[in-house]
């Protein structure tokens, strides 16, 4: 039993054989010649005289065959005019020569049509096969014509081509689709009207709508110029019923977005706004009011005077008045700085009123021939600038400025530095550049707070050995005679005097302590005024000088001139490679450059 059920189920799964449908039977076409009628298009209101004006060149020739069974022959298109107002044809195409027995077919092309157009020779095969179906469609179209006429009054005319009903045969659908596809809506879309309540407009009803011909909007690719609205004929309208249009139900208005303006820099925007405000402002006329003049009686008792007169002051008096005013303002407002730079003062103004409060004083670029004594009374002065003045000497009383930290006296005529200058314990910066200074005293070692020393443009040949005891941060000595070619010349020594040699011999051997009687003349020669830079003993006279260089203060080959007491000290320092300075003693390396090449016999001194 199970085998039978399985066999029956298996037989049901076989695929069914499908038979290919037979083609439909087409009716036999009659072998009868069909005449071609002249089809006229256009508006019904166009006169017949305008149609007769077409020349033979402005027609389309279509030849109809004798029988349907014969092969179709191609049509010959001579010329198609797209614009009646122009005399010259737009294009001429001759594909085949004109055969005999050709009938002319007049086909009117709208002015706005452009591109290729295909004129069918006969009805399509679908119209011959489905003739009954087409007739039913035609009846349905006729019943809908009345509804279409009503829709024309309601819908806006956009890209619409209305053809007259005088055509003998309807155009095939392929041709209508070809013409409709050639037009492109290039205009802007209709903007909806704003929503306004209770607004009614009365318009006349259009009756003969189908008699009017509406030309579609020309495409952007069409080269045919469109006639202006003033040249076009007005449509025929008849005043009939009145239609009331209520715009209360229209959609609300939408505001267009504001265009994005190009960005401008803020400076340009400010300038443009200023220009616009000047243009908008109206210039008000200046009102001139005439005041009545007072007439004086000549017989009246009136006192007349010249009033105040300007007194012509000299340049020096004017400058002195300005400096006095600056000092008064400094005193009133409690200021602690005065700047008289570039006043060309011949003398310093009185500074006693601000002697205790002044900290900064600048007297640069003036005409001070002497060091101003008024500055010495400024007890709390810390910065003093006397640059570019014809000062020739610095008084030793400068040591009264105990708190002076920065002293600048460059571009003057200073020849030497006083001993009182080296008593300023708080001095940090000293600028004596471009002066006539020839040497720097060894007492500079007392300025233990000195950090910056500037001696540019001076006549110095070397630095004293006391500079090795300082803690300088910056040392400047450009445009000087400290270069190595001048070292040998500046190391020449004069022969010592006999009195100096004898005094040195007596002191070193302590003979002045052994002798009970020292004459007064001998005691006068035994007094020493300086010490030896090598043995630190007494030195009589100038001694012997030698220049040795060392690398110090971040500079290389800084020349140091040592003054020794005797020939023995001279030979020792010449052969030594270091020197001890300071307390505790600091070992400073000396460069063995030019002294190794010289011999003792070449030393320029005499015994």
Curated annotation (Swiss-Prot):
Name of one Pfam family that matches = LRR_14
Output the Gene3D superfamilies linked to this UniProt entry. Answer: Ribonuclease Inhibitor
Gene Ontology BP annotations? intracellular signal transduction
Keywords, ordered alphabetically? Leucine-rich repeat, Repeat
Q: Repeat: is it a keyword of this entry?
A: yes
- Classify the source by domain of life: Eukaryota
Intervals holding LRR repeats = 357-378, 380-401, 403-424, 426-447, 449-470, 471-497, 498-524
What is this protein's name? Leucine-rich repeat-containing protein 63
């Amino acid at each position: 039993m199970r085998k039978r059920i399985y066999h029956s189920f298996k037989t049901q799964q076989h695929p069914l054989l499908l038979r290919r449908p037979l083609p439909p039977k087409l009716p036999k076409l009659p072998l009868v010649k069909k005449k071609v009628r002249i089809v006229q298009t256009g508006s019904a209101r166009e006169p017949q005289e305008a149609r007769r004006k077409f020349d033979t060149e402005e027609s389309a020739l279509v030849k109809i065959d004798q029988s349907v069974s014969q092969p179709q022959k191609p049509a010959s298109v001579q010329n198609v005019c797209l614009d009646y107002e122009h005399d010259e044809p737009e294009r001429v195409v001759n594909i085949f020569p004109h055969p005999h027995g050709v009938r002319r077919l007049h086909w009117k092309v709208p002015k706005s049509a452009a591109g290729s157009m295909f004129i069918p020779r006969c009805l399509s095969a679908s119209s011959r096969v489905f003739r009954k179906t087409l007739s039913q469609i035609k009846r349905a179209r006729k019943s809908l014509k009345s509804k279409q006429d009503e829709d024309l009054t309601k819908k806006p005319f956009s890209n619409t081509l209305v053809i007259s009903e005088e055509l003998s045969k309807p155009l095939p659908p392929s041709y209508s689709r070809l013409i409709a596809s050639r037009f492109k809506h290039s205009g802007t879309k209709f903007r909806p009207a704003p929503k306004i309540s209770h607004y009614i407009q009365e318009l006349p009803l259009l009756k003969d709508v189908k008699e009017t011909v509406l030309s579609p909007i020309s495409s952007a690719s069409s080269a045919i110029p469109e006639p202006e609205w003033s040249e076009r004929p007005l449509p025929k309208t008849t005043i009939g019923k009145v239609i009331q249009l209520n715009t209360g139900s229209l959609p609300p208005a939408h505001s267009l977005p504001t265009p994005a303006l190009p960005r401008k820099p803020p400076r340009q925007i400010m300038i443009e706004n200023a220009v616009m405000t000047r243009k908008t402002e109206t210039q008000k006329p200046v009102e001139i009011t005439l005041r009545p003049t007072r007439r004086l009686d000549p017989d009246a008792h009136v006192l007349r005077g010249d009033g105040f007169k300007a007194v012509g002051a000299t340049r020096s008096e004017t400058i002195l008045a300005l400096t006095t005013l600056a000092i008064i303002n400094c005193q009133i407002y409690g200021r602690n700085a005065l700047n008289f730079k570039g006043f060309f003062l011949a003398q310093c103004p009185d500074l006693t009123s601000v002697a205790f409060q002044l900290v900064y004083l600048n007297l640069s670029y003036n005409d001070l021939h002497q060091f101003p004594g008024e500055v010495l009374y400024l007890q709390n002065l810390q910065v003093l600038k006397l640059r570019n003045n014809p000062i020739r000497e610095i008084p030793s009383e400068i040591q009264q400025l105990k708190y002076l930290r920065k002293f600048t006296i460059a571009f003057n005529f200073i020849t030497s530095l006083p001993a009182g200058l080296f008593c300023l314990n708080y001095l940090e910066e000293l600028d004596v550049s471009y002066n006539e200074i020839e040497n720097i005293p060894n007492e500079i070692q007392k300025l233990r707070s000195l950090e910056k020393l500037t001696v540019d443009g001076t006549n110095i040949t070397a630095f004293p050995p006391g500079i090795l005891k300082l803690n300088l941060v910056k040392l400047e000595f450009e445009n000087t005679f400290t270069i190595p070619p001048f070292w040998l010349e500046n190391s020449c020594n004069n022969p010592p005097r006999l009195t100096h040699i004898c005094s040195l011999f007596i002191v070193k051997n302590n003979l002045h302590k052994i002798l009970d009687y020292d004459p007064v003349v001998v005691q006068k020669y035994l007094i020493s005024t300086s010490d030896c830079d090598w043995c630190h003993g007494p030195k009589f006279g100038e001694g012997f000088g030698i220049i040795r260089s060392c690398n110090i203060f971040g500079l290389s080959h800084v020349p140091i001139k040592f003054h020794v007491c005797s020939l023995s000290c001279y030979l020792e320092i010449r052969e030594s490679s270091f020197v001890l300075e300071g307390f505790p003693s600091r070992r400073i390396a000396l460069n063995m450059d030019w002294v190794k090449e010289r011999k003792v016999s070449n030393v320029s001194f005499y015994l």
